[in-house]
Amino acid sequence: MLEKILATKREEISQLQLPEKQYFPKKSLKASLQKTSLPLGLIAEIKQASPSKGVLCETISPTAIARVYEEGGASAISVLTDRTYFQGDTAYVAEVKKTVSLPVLRKDFILSPLQVEETACIGADAMLLIAGAMEAKQLHELYELAYSKGLECLVEVHSEEELESLLAVFTPEVIGINNRNLKTFQTSVSQTEQIAKMVPKEALLVSESGIHTPDDIARVKKAGANAVLIGEQLMRKDDKRQAIIDLFSESAINQ
Ligand SMILES: O=C(O)c1ccccc1NCC(=O)[C@H](O)[C@H](O)COP(=O)(O)O
């Protein structure tokens, strides 16, 4: 699946024109995740559809969702900007930035320096880089370019091998372990439990995908995660604020 998405993305990049630059106060993803009021940091995701689950919500208001996520205690908002597979939009980033004071992570398949430029133009604070999408050396170049433009990166791995290749080149400040197998689409927090041991202590660790219960959160926290990235579980709920309260119930997580 990742190959199919990346092929579409390469096609889009060949047509990409930079939008007008949007200016917003910068917010640090890493700092915000470190000073959470919840038992661990929460990157709450705005995602209308996905390749694995199809359409999650017929219509969405990214600004209304972002406001509720902020009220619920999220540390950052992840905004899907890919249109083809996730029904996202690059315009959502600025809309969310105008609405909340949290850092905004642009979630897309970033493969080229031009997309890094675009990410800075649309007003994001941070962007995703996927280790499985390119060589570690190329990822490092995009990472350095992003930081030179004031953007932080969430660097995502799906396996021990990917993390090993990455660490041979550099140690990202924020590392995500994605619990979703991109071939089968199955998710399991045991991915985080397995790979977290290899994450250097100086990196901030985010467990991503397939987090649906307080027990999932308790397990990844115990494995060493500093934060979680949650999409579907929140997007499917009408009362997203209550959904955050239910997921992060202290007693369930700390038992
Ligand atoms: O969500 C998918 O189906 C998907 C398929 C292929 C590549 C990426 C995909 N998702 C991107 C994500 O990383 C998730 O949206 C994010 O981690 C949240 O996951 P979830 O809480 O399971 O919605």
Curated annotation (Swiss-Prot):
Key word Transcription regulation present: no
Pathway involvement of the protein, from the record: Amino-acid biosynthesis; L-tryptophan biosynthesis; L-tryptophan from chorismate: step 4/5
A biological process term (GO) from this entry: L-tryptophan biosynthetic process
GO molecular function: indole-3-glycerol-phosphate synthase activity; phosphoribosylanthranilate isomerase activity
Pfam families: IGPS
EC numbers, comma separated: 4.1.1.48
Catalytic activity entry: 1-(2-carboxyphenylamino)-1-deoxy-D-ribulose 5-phosphate + H(+) = (1S,2R)-1-C-(indol-3-yl)glycerol 3-phosphate + CO2 + H2O
InterPro entries: Aldolase_TIM, Indole-3-glycerol_P_synth, Indole-3-glycerol_P_synth_dom, Indole-3-GlycerolPSynthase_CS, RibuloseP-bd_barrel
Annotated SUPFAM superfamilies: Ribulose-phoshate binding barrel
Gene3D superfamilies from the UniProt entry: Aldolase class I
Keywords recorded for this protein, A-Z: Amino-acid biosynthesis, Aromatic amino acid biosynthesis, Decarboxylase, Lyase, Tryptophan biosynthesis
Superkingdom of the source species: Bacteria
Keyword Flavoprotein appears in the UniProt entry: no
UniProt xrefs under HAMAP family: IGPS_B (MF_00134_B)
PANTHER family registered for this protein in UniProt: INDOLE-3-GLYCEROL-PHOSPHATE SYNTHASE (PTHR22854:SF2), TRYPTOPHAN BIOSYNTHESIS PROTEIN (PTHR22854)
Family recorded in the similarity comment: Belongs to the TrpC family.
Name assigned to this protein: Indole-3-glycerol phosphate synthase
